[in-house]
Amino acid sequence: MTHPDLPRTLRHRDAALRVSPWRGRTDIVVAGPIPGTQPSAAQVHTAVEKLFAAGVSEVYTTALGPPEQQPFIAAGFSHREHLRLLRHDLRDLPTPRAPASHHLRRGWRRDYAEVLDVDAVAFDGFWQFDRRSLVEARNATPTSRFRVADASPLDASPLDASPSDDRTPATPPSGVVGYAVTGRANRTCYLQRLAVHPRHQGVGTGTALVCDALQWAHARRADDVLVNTQEGNTAAFELYLGLGFTDQTNGLDVLHRDNR
């Protein structure tokens, strides 16, 4: 099965699922409801059976809250991973902090290779991004911000640009040690991804990237910022709490179903 054979959206009556390959594989996919929709169990079942008929062997869901999970569980999905969900109300912003070892700048498409190298060592295999995952994270919301922490000298990097400037720098940047993708939809912002190279953790890199995301969200008059993190990622959880996020009660879950 090739990429063109995999539908990006599966529609059944009035509900739809957004579908994408899992880490470049088309025999394993990620599916989730289109924002603002709530499919029934029958609609989920029909959509998944279409995927199985097309040659898909396994389906993972996007991270879902308890109400969103119900039709998938009723359609035969089981829990695979639990995520903690945290929220920042943007009322008391932390003071931006910039470690002397690097600077923050806008991320470019030319950074993707280095960014994905960082991602590969920051997360275990199940959670790692590939290029398509990164692009989808940037495009998941109407507006987004892509920032990188760069350890190269300032005079070796292109000048920063405004969020609306999509020009490509003449000189490709280097020295990426961390990155963040933040998106805004309606009045809520989402810290879609935060990754720091293990060799640069514990020196303020993650703090600087999160503070940047919060400042950006506040400047765009968002009501809050949401972020999720793996249940066992204590370092990230404590980082968010220390910067003013609060733990939400139920969290999120990734569900799974295979073709058996």
Q: Model-predicted segments: where are they?
A:
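A short helix-loop-beta-strand connector motif used in the catalytic cores of GNAT acetyltransferases and
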Residues: 2-8, 13, 55, 80-82, ...
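Conserved acetyl-CoA-binding loop-helix of GNAT-fold acetyltransferases
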Residues: 38-49, 196, 202-215, 219, ...
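N-terminal charged segments
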Residues: 1-54
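A short beta-loop-alpha structural element at the N-terminal edge
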Residues: 103-115
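A conserved beta-strand-loop-helix scaffold within acyl/acetyltransferase catalytic domains
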Residues: 130-145, 150-151, 172-195
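Conserved beta-strand-loop-alpha-helix junction that forms the acyl-donor binding cleft
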Residues: 60-69, 198-201, 227-237, 253-260
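Acyl-donor-binding surface of acyltransferase catalytic domains
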Residues: 33-100, 253-255
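Conserved active-site alpha-helix within GNAT-family acetyltransferase domains
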Residues: 65-81, 203, 207, 219, ...
